[in-house]
Amino acid sequence: MSTRYHQAASDSYLELLKEATKRDLNLSDEDGMTPTLLAAYHGNLEALEIICSRGGDPDKCDIWGNTPLHYAASNGHTHCISFLVNFGANIFALDNDLKSPLDAAASREQKECVALLDKAATVQNTMNPKRVTRLKEQALKNARKQMKECERLQERHQNKMARTYSKEDSGTISSSHSTLSRSFLSTTSAGRFGSLSKGIKDTFKIKSKKNKDTTEQLEKDGRSGQRPVMEVFREEEEDSFPKDFKEKLHFSVEEDDDVQHESILNRPGLGSIVFSRNRVLDFEDISDSKRELGFKMPSELFQRQGAAGTVEEEEEEEEEEEEEKREANGTAGDLPWDEEEVEWEEDAVDATPLEVFLQSQHLEEFLPIFMREQIDLEALLLCSDEDLQNIHMQLGPRKKVLSAIDKRKQVLQQPGQLVDTSL
């Protein structure tokens, strides 16, 4: 996971790196790159000094086994190589191809880096050959472990790509099948429905012609023997109709109305009892559901009100218990802070005496210089103006450091009285 400290190490943004913790400086991104590796890759010496002084691991590698020395040697950053060698980085570290930083510099034809690493290797071989053999064995062991880790990551990535590729293939095949089936269905349905509609239209035309011919013939035959309409009924003959005929006529009209209203249920061959029974059952179900709702609603409302009342009673009891605890522990309320809100920094790194001394005198920017020369607080108190001049410190910083040393010596010689301070 890439963080802002990775970007600060790449861009040599020193103010942000001074706030980083040991965990932040050793956190790897997707490629296994840490801020230490990025600072060595880009040749940012000041950023590399701050990172290593705040706990950055100079021997941590990426997924390909490259350490900060590998990147500095490959890109020709001699100043970073000299700092890492003096800081104690393993110059015999191996990558996944079992190549050391010296081999990486030789493959890129970085002659100065090759000479610097060769000189450091000869010095370590002459001074402590047992330590050199132990470092080489450890480097080989770490390289084999890193190779297995890299193979596992590659296998996982290949399986993931294969799954995504198979999903894409299945999606394209299904889409092609669906398009083919749709086109086939559309063509067949269009042909069938077109022929059917054409046949239906032809039959309707033929029937309409026949109906017209028959109606015309019937009208002609009927009109030949009919009387005019005005001659059929007269006002004088209206009262002469018998009452039985009128009652029959009225009854026939009512029957026609009943037939028209009951035509939905009275179907020939289906049965009117089935439909009417279903209608009756539907009404009964609706009435039963209404009754159930009518019985359920009040009980649910009473339950909710009771639950709300119980919740309020529980809250009041909890508040009373808290007040009793506060009264019993009277000292807890006297504290000016809340102990639960106090947050402790988990990743805080224990500062060295030299770092504490420089921080107290506002001289923390000179810490990388002393770390590079392996100077601790005791050695710094023994340094003179000439010693500081030999490590290439300028006049202004030398005067500040010397005055701070004098103040410390005076305080140690004449310590003051211990006095309690108020919070």
UniProtKB/Swiss-Prot annotation:
Swiss-Prot/TrEMBL ANK repeat ranges: 31-60, 64-93, 97-126
Predominant localisation class: other
InterPro entries: ANKS4B_SAM, Ankyrin_rpt, Ankyrin_rpt-contain_sf, SAM, SAM/pointed_sf
Region (Disordered), start-end ranges: 158-181, 207-227, 303-335
Domain SAM intervals: 357-409
Compositionally biased spans, kind Acidic residues: 311-324
Keyword set, alphabetical order: ANK repeat, Cell projection, Coiled coil, Differentiation, Repeat
PROSITE patterns listed in its UniProt record: ANK_REP_REGION, ANK_REPEAT
Gene Ontology process terms (BP): brush border assembly; cell differentiation; protein localization to microvillus; protein-containing complex assembly; response to endoplasmic reticulum stress
Motif PDZ-binding per UniProt: ranges: 421-423
Composition bias type Basic and acidic residues, residue spans: 207-224
Keyword Repeat applies: yes
Subcellular localization(s) per the UniProt record: Cell projection, Microvillus
SUPFAM superfamilies: Ankyrin repeat (SSF48403), SAM/Pointed domain (SSF47769)
Quaternary structure, from the entry: Part of the IMAC/intermicrovillar adhesion complex/intermicrovillar tip-link complex composed of ANKS4B, MYO7B, USH1C, CDHR2 and CDHR5. Interacts with USH1C; the interaction is direct and is required for ANKS4B localization to the tip of microvilli. Interacts with MYO7B; the interaction is direct. May interact with HSPA5.
The protein's role, per its UniProt record: As part of the intermicrovillar adhesion complex/IMAC plays a role in epithelial brush border differentiation, controlling microvilli organization and length. Plays a role in assembly of the complex. May play a role in cellular response to endoplasmic reticulum stress.
Name of protein: Ankyrin repeat and SAM domain-containing protein 4B
